[in-house]
Amino acid sequence: MGAAGNTGSSGDSRELMSAADVGRTVSRIAHQIIEKTALDGPDGPRVVLLGIPTRGVTLADRLARNIGEYSGVEVGHGALDITLYRDDLMQKPPRPLEATSIPAGGIDDALVILVDDVLYSGRSVRSALDALRDVGRPRVVQLAVLVDRGHRELPLRAEYVGKNVPTSRSESVHVLLAEHDGADGVVISR
């Protein structure tokens, strides 16, 4: 996604996170979600993780597996396609629609955690909030990201952040995940 950077890398680049770092970070975010939501408590909320395609869906799947392993609570997870809700639809090359998949219980009255790989301007998150409105009415919506690179254009913040990485606007942050790229890692490039 261009400047947000979640596909490939080019030019001068340097590693920000190794595969081991990515694994530890996803594990830490899973623990934070369990702790902050009291998910494993007697009155824990129904939590649904919805990944923003493409890499956010993979991260949501990994988080759900980790949360289940650490807490013993199975968390519903799926994908939320934001393509038709983007405000830059006519400015970027066309991209294929992704499937939106919502867990069987739906999202009404659930604590929904949107999951994305990189938080940059906040426009993808705004698009996800618009898409979410057409799917149901969650009780609470939170955001989890692997990397927050700053430069917000909208008043949004993530509750769960793997790594804060100050960047310039001329740099791109690329999250690599084994399921898509053959290996895990995060690189920054100019």
From Swiss-Prot:
<keyword id="KW-0804">Transcription</keyword>
<keyword id="KW-0805">Transcription regulation</keyword>
<keyword id="KW-0328">Glycosyltransferase</keyword>
<protein>
    <recommendedName>
        <fullName>Bifunctional protein PyrR</fullName>
        <ecNumber>2.4.2.9</ecNumber>
    </recommendedName>
</protein>
<dbReference type="InterPro" id="IPR029057">
    <property type="entry name" value="PRTase-like"/>
</dbReference>
<keyword id="KW-0808">Transferase</keyword>
<dbReference type="InterPro" id="IPR023050">
    <property type="entry name" value="PyrR"/>
</dbReference>
<feature type="short sequence motif" description="PRPP-binding">
    <location>
        <begin position="112"/>
        <end position="124"/>
    </location>
</feature>
<dbReference type="GO" id="GO:0006355">
    <property type="term" value="P:regulation of DNA-templated transcription"/>
</dbReference>
<dbReference type="InterPro" id="IPR000836">
    <property type="entry name" value="PRibTrfase_dom"/>
</dbReference>
<dbReference type="Pfam" id="PF00156">
    <property type="entry name" value="Pribosyltran"/>
</dbReference>
<dbReference type="InterPro" id="IPR050137">
    <property type="entry name" value="PyrR_bifunctional"/>
</dbReference>
<comment type="function">
    <text>Regulates the transcription of the pyrimidine nucleotide (pyr) operon in response to exogenous pyrimidines.</text>
</comment>
<dbReference type="GO" id="GO:0004845">
    <property type="term" value="F:uracil phosphoribosyltransferase activity"/>
</dbReference>
<comment type="similarity">
    <text>Belongs to the purine/pyrimidine phosphoribosyltransferase family. PyrR subfamily.</text>
</comment>
<comment type="function">
    <text>Also displays a weak uracil phosphoribosyltransferase activity which is not physiologically significant.</text>
</comment>
